[in-house]
Amino acid sequence: MQNPQNLIWIDLEMTGLDPDRDVIIEMATIVTDSDLNTLAEGPVIAIHQPEEVLAGMDEWNTRQHGQSGLTQRVRESTVSMAEAEAQTLAFLEQWVPKRSSPICGNSICQDRRFLYRHMPRLEGYFHYRNLDVSTLKELAARWAPQVRESFKKGNTHLALDDIRESIAELRHYRDHFIKL
């Protein structure tokens, strides 16, 4: 059921950090209510890329995505960038009205840059604001290091796992850093 207070969480895995050269290889979304309770998990999509694109990844991405199994999932996938965008939009339209939710996640500006370049319809679905958990992480590191250090991430670099960790991290900062 659509609710303008719901939040859209997204994470992308890419072949690198440059949206003009690199591409999205995995995406996932979660919708939460405003209290960070998960309402629905969207499709987790490995996006097919040709072998020459995968061969162009740097050492870190080659190792990380190879070890996680993502590179193989991308090779085996038949889902195009356009199909992934359409599937994700169809999911989000059930839960959140267009342009009502900020884009939510960790270092979310990077994801937004890739969406703007490769999935402009999806990028346009979000409100122009960002809810970036990394802002609180940076503030906690400076103002309350014990709070920052008390949250440990798994760092699987798989899209759905990363979103779940971002939501848990924001809950952690809400409970231990932000005085409500």
Swiss-Prot record:
**Domain Exonuclease residues, every copy:** 7-170
SMART domains in alphabetical order:
EXOIII
Q: Carries keyword Nuclease?
A: yes
Which terms in the GO cellular component ontology are assigned? cytoplasm
Query: Pfam families, from UniProt?
Result: RNase_T (PF00929)
Per the record, the major location class is cytoplasm
What Enzyme Commission number does this protein have?
A: 3.1.15.-
Q: Which SUPFAM superfamilies match?
A: Ribonuclease H-like
Under PANTHER family, the record lists: OLIGORIBONUCLEASE, MITOCHONDRIAL
Q: What is this protein called?
A: Oligoribonuclease
